[in-house]
Design a protein with these regions (language model features):
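Short, solvent-exposed loop/turn segments that connect beta-strands within catalytic domains
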Residues: 74-77, 272, 327-330, 366-368
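Periplasmic polypeptide-binding modules associated with outer-membrane biogenesis and secretion
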Residues: 11-99, 109, 125-141, 204-206, ...
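C-terminal outer-membrane beta-barrel translocator/porin domains of Gram-negative envelope proteins
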Residues: 222-338, 344-346, 376, 391-392
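Short glycine-rich, acidic/polar surface loops and turns
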Residues: 355-362
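Gram-negative/organellar outer-membrane beta-barrel architecture
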Residues: 76, 84-234, 240, 294-301, ...
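Short, glycine/charged-rich beta-strand-loop motifs at protein surfaces that mediate ligand recognition
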Residues: 172, 344-350
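Bacterial N-terminal signal peptides
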Residues: 1-6
Length: 395
């Protein structure tokens, strides 16, 4: 429950002398104070309580936020911003499972979404399915401002029995792989809504039980730019975001490789509990081995086969999401969507399809990520449904 308190009655000209937090347990006060340091010395009539709520909601660390202004001091009146919070559960061992049109997937993750009390993210664990076994470790430190850059690291090892499908759903490639990947990047928040990052990415694939491929390696330097603006309306964090990422590198096949990806999202609240989401995403690779082809997630597509692979994909869609109820345990929502996607197929032609989707989500109030996601999408051109039910992690 969030409350806005009128501050018109406070003495004119009173300035903010302190931002006072109550209820912090794991979160370091120095971290959240830094988020709000611009309010120090601000005239109290210029304090935007809704903006403070949005800044804190965007951290994903608090289930309850109560902001008020307090006038203190008789001889020299000053204003204190009082913020009472209740922290979410951000550290937990998390078993998860997912069942989709492509089969079962499960695993276990040890997740800390507020490591060191500064919203550092530390995740480690394994993902298992009949066709793949993956171990992974990830760490991320967010960029706060120009003086405090961000840092992220990701690595994974997998043994996979993968088949690649073309647009029609036919198997065009099937092999057993041992793969490894690593990603390292640093980021700088140049403006409150604009972040730039540079890094490097490494991939390795050893195709087992065949001599057709040698062990494949590729390395690339990466650069990305992202824009994001959020606004809390009491039900959702309404977001407008865009990002662009490019990579350029070299492969073990002695050739220059590259690629580019983009995504954008515009959210509009129709009423407080109903929002529209216009989204788009796409990617292409240049000169990369077919083993490293893109999946449907690069185009934010739900209607394609999960085993489909391509070197070019672009998709756009529109979603309407409505929150049915909000209780102490969390929020339940339903959504309907429609998407269009175009891809470059294995036969060197471009093909497209479109179709509707629908589903529901459960966001638990006390944890920092979705708890249950159920969805289905229909590919009109192929007359085929794709569906997924996941518990613990949003796949």
């Amino acid at each position: 429950m969030f409350f806005l308190f009128s501050y018109c009655a406070f003495a004119e000209g009173s300035k903010v002398s302190e931002v006072r937090f109550e209820g912090l347990k794991k979160t370091k006060e120095s971290y959240v104070q830094k988020l709000l340091e611009k309010y120090a010395g601000m005239e109290e009539e210029n304090v935007d309580i809704k903006e403070i709520e949005t800044l804190l909601q965007a951290q994903g660390l608090f289930s309850e936020i109560n902001v008020s202004l307090s006038s203190e001091g008789e001889e020299t009146p000053h204003t204190v911003i009082v913020i009472k919070v209740k922290e979410k559960i951000t550290f937990l061992p998390l078993p998860f499972a997912s069942y989709s049109s492509d089969g079962f997937m499960g695993g276990f993750m040890l997740m800390n979404m507020n490591a060191f009390g500064k919203k550092y993210t530390l995740v480690g664990g394994g993902i298992f399915s009949p066709s793949a076994q993956t171990g992974m470790l990830a760490f991320a430190k967010p960029a706060v401002d120009m003086q405090h850059p961000g840092f992220s690291f990701y690595t994974s090892l997998s043994r996979k029995n993968l088949e690649f499908l073309n647009f029609a759903g036919d198997t065009v490639m099937e092999n057993k792989y041992f793969t490894a990947a690593a990603d390292l990047s640093v980021s700088e928040k140049l403006l409150p809504f604009f972040t730039c990052s540079i890094g490097s990415h490494f991939d390795m694939a050893d195709v087992l039980e065949t001599d057709e491929y040698p062990v494949l390696y590729q390395w690339a330097g990466t650069m990305s730019f992202s824009l994001q603006n959020v606004n809390w309306n009491g039900w959702y964090l309404i977001s407008q975001s865009a990002s662009l990422k490019g990579e350029l590198g070299w492969s073990s096949e002695d050739r220059l490789i590259g690629g580019c990806s983009f995504k954008g999202e515009l959210q509009v609240p129709f009423v407080p509990r109903v929002r529209g989401i216009l989204s788009g995403a796409g990617a292409f690779t240049y000169n990369q081995n077919e083993v490293f082809r893109l999946s449907k997630s690069s185009g934010a597509s739900a209607i394609l086969d999960s085993k489909f692979r391509t070197d070019f994909i672009a998709g756009t869609g529109f979603t309407v999401e409505a929150a049915l109820l909000k209780r102490k345990f969390g929020t339940v929502s339903v959504y309907g969507s429609y998407e269009y996607v175009i891809v470059h197929d294995f036969d060197d032609t471009f093909k497209s399809s479109n179709g509707p989707g629908f589903g529901g989500k459960l966001y638990l109030q006390q944890v920092a990520f979705p708890a249950v996601v159920m969805g289905a999408a229909y590919n009109i051109k192929r007359n085929k449904w794709q569906y997924v039910i996941s518990v613990g992690v949003n796949f």
